[in-house]
């Protein structure tokens, strides 16, 4: 059975291609929040939020104010979605690149990035120079990204490289724990 967590079960209507842009982002986020609960009422950036499903979950389940930040999904689209979901007073849609975040230094209590960090965070200096400065001292950074059980080789690596249009830098972000 896919759904066994009651907290996630409430959101099963969103488990469609329209909202999910990768693995089950709510399952990943829920597991992370179990280990690292956020302070209710805190200010959180959902970096790489996509269609805002993780922002919805953060607002409803963690009780935080969310800055739903994404480069690929227009903020206006997310604003409409957030209004429809009744969270427009708790979640602010932001259209921004992780390399040029429009926030003051030390602005966030936490930064969450579920299934997105590997798109922008693998480049040297992005985390320390672009992302970390907007996190308050003592703040929490939570990230979950795809991984593989074994190193990619042979046909699997060739297919993934083809899918990534030959960009070896992107392929280099997929490694197993033993790497």
Question: Locations of the language-model features?
Answer:
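Acceptor-substrate binding/catalytic loop of class I
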Residues: 160-178
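Conserved class I S-adenosyl-L-methionine
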Residues: 140-166
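A short SAM/SAH-binding and catalytic strip from SAM-dependent methyltransferases
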Residues: 110-123
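A short acidic, Gly/Pro-enriched loop at the edge of an enzyme's catalytic core
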Residues: 99-111
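Conserved SAM-binding loop and adjacent beta-strand
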Residues: 14-30
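A short glycine-rich, Lys/Arg-flanked "PGG" loop and its adjoining helix->strand segment in the class I
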Residues: 125-140
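N-terminal, positively charged/glycine-rich alpha-helical extensions of SAM-dependent methyltransferases
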Residues: 1-13
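Class I SAM-dependent methyltransferase SAM/SAH-binding core
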Residues: 45-47, 51-100
């Amino acid at each position: 059975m896919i759904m066994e967590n009651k907290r996630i079960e409430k959101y099963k209507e969103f488990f469609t291609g329209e909202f999910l842009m990768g693995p089950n982002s709510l399952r990943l986020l829920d597991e992370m929040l179990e280990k690292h609960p956020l302070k209710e009422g805190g200010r959180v950036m959902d970096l790489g939020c996509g269609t805002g499903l993780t922002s919805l979950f953060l607002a409803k389940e963690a009780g935080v104010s969310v800055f739903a930040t994404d480069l690929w999904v227009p903020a206006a689209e997310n604003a409409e979605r957030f209004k429809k979901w009744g969270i427009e007073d708790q979640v602010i849609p932001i259209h921004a690149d992780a390399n040029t975040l429009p926030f003051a230094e030390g602005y966030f209590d936490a930064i969450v990035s579920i299934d997105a960090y590997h798109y922008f965070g693998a480049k040297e200096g992005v985390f320390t120079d672009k992302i970390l400065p907007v996190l308050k001292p003592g703040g929490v950074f939570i990230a979950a990204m795809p991984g593989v059980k074994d190193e990619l080789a042979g046909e699997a690596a060739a297919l993934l490289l083809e899918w990534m249009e030959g960009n070896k830098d992107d392929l280099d972000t997929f490694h197993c724990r033993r790497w």
